[in-house]
Amino acid sequence: QIDKYMGYREYYSNIIGSKELAEEFVSLYSKAEQDIITLQTILLQYADKQIDKNTCIDKLLEIYKYNGHALGFYMSNQIIKAGLRDEMIKEFHNPYEFYRLYLLATNKNNDKLLSRKFLSYLKMATEQYYK
């Protein structure tokens, strides 16, 4: 989590070293909440067979810039802000659990919510890999 006295722009500038790239990360971070909703929409379209696998992957790659670091960083900060840091540390490797914790965090922070249908699909899609 970013030190509360340091802004995101300063944080990214310090760790990245390139002003342009730091600005891109700040931009990605600032639109992360909307990107999470878009990601949910894409995966539900795939789950409902409205789009094929290749289209799904192409659309997800538009969101997961730089391996999704800004998105994951945003989600982690929301989880920590909601007091769920320890749970996140235990479960961060499991995509379903990470998104479940994000949902709990958004409930606590009164932000936009993920749908149960999305979480059910994510659980089903990942349970064979994460037990």
Per-region residue spans from a language model:
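Zinc-dependent metallopeptidase catalytic helix centered on the HExxH motif
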Residues: 1-30
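Pan-zinc metallopeptidase signature
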Residues: 20-131
